[in-house]
Amino acid sequence: MKKFTRRDILKATVPSSLAMMAIPTIIPSTAFGANDRMRVAVIGINGRGKDHIKGFMSLDNVEVATLCDVDNVVLKAGAKAFEEKYNKKVNIEEDLRKVYEDKSIDAVSIATPNHWHALAAIWACQAGKDVYVEKPACHNLFEGRKLVEAATKYNRIVQNGVQLRSSVAIQEAIKHLREGLIGKVYMARGTVYKWRPDIGDLGKSPIPEGLNWDLWQGPAQAREFSKNYVHYNWHWFWEYGNGDVGNQGIHETDLCMWGLDVGLPETITAAGGKYLWNDCKETPEVLSTTYNYPKQGKVIQMEVRPWMTNKEDGVEVGNIFYGDKGYMVINGYNDYKTYLGKNREPGPARNAGGDHYKNFIDAVRAKDKSLLNGPVETAHLAASIAHLGNISYRLGRTLHFDPTKESFVGDKEANAMLTRKYRAPFVVPDKV
């Protein structure tokens, strides 16, 4: 198979509308000084934060120096596990603002619930920290744009946790799409078929000992505590999460847009609902969304199903791209296959991963945001397209959107849902 140069990869993986964002080659750790040790704080350590800790601790000259979590039980257990595994002490903090005051911290890695992502990242930029932030980078479109502005204003490195962008195979797949391997690519499909069980309705209950419930809620409106919210099922409540299209689906929305070389759409139509469980989830179990790009002659289809369901060409979670000479199947984060012509003859294929954490650290060390594989601009777009679909679903109608102004056309009701009511002092400001 042809070997790709850095110039090849850069041309293939940078959308024309975002041409400043380069896809780098991997930089060896020997390129940096032996004393150039990076100190990272991980904020939110109960879910994805565990992977963040593992990922950063596996890198040369990188130290996870601080763990931060609003649940003291989780925090102490996490610190104990860290010290046992790595044979070193780690600082602990309940309040992320204390972390940002620590001038010895070079970068923060944010793995909180969705409603905290953008504000935590904006505060970090304002404090002079570089940021790795889990997907989605924002809970609504407004705060995604504010995060882009903050990263620019404070000249910070901000990486989004969409690790498939660092996959060698996926970078190669995008290059094939750009070069016309499957012809004119007119449609991308994202599939999110994951088991999401009945969560019941546990009602309200006393706040567990050790949990700072006020700080957990942060920007969200105050509610009584429920075990249905903490620690994972907050995903299914609009105040904190964005449903599965804004959870797992961000990987797939991001890849749809990357592969089609498009930004935000002009029309959005979503339909779905709750059909399986009589539980207290607010977000849909099933969601089918169509995003149209009439000027480019392209369309994105996103499909969320909770199981049981068929696979699509072997894919449960992934993407399919359709062209006039064939189609491409991307299964997960590190694998692609192509099928060419009317007889669907097998074409180029590859399975190969990458290291998204290392890519972030390389960019931080080099002080060069162009090295990022998952830059803040694409983070905003991948999250915002999911938010647009959710708004269409919640309003029950097709919406018309102006991608340049990032607002709906003549629709006050829909535009009001591009942001949220914030709870002081946890406010994403208009001027960052």
Regions flagged by a language model, labelled:
Residues 1-17:
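N-terminal secretory signal peptides and thylakoid transit peptides that target proteins
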Residues 13-85, 164-167, 256:
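N-terminal Rossmann-like dinucleotide-binding module
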Residues 50-54, 75-80, 97-98, 118-123, ...:
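Pocket-flanking alpha-helical
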Residues 90-95:
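Conserved SAM-binding strand-loop segment of SAM-dependent methyltransferases
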Residues 108-109:
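N-terminal Rossmann-like NAD(P) cofactor-binding module of classical short-chain dehydrogenase/reductase
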Residues 113-114, 118-166, 180:
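Beta-strand-loop-alpha-helix segment that lines the small-molecule cofactor/substrate pocket
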Residues 159, 175-176, 185:
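Hydrophobic or amphipathic alpha-helical targeting/insertion segments
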Residues 172, 181-184, 189-335, 342-432:
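Contiguous beta-strand/loop segments that form the cofactor/metal-binding neighborhood of enzyme cores
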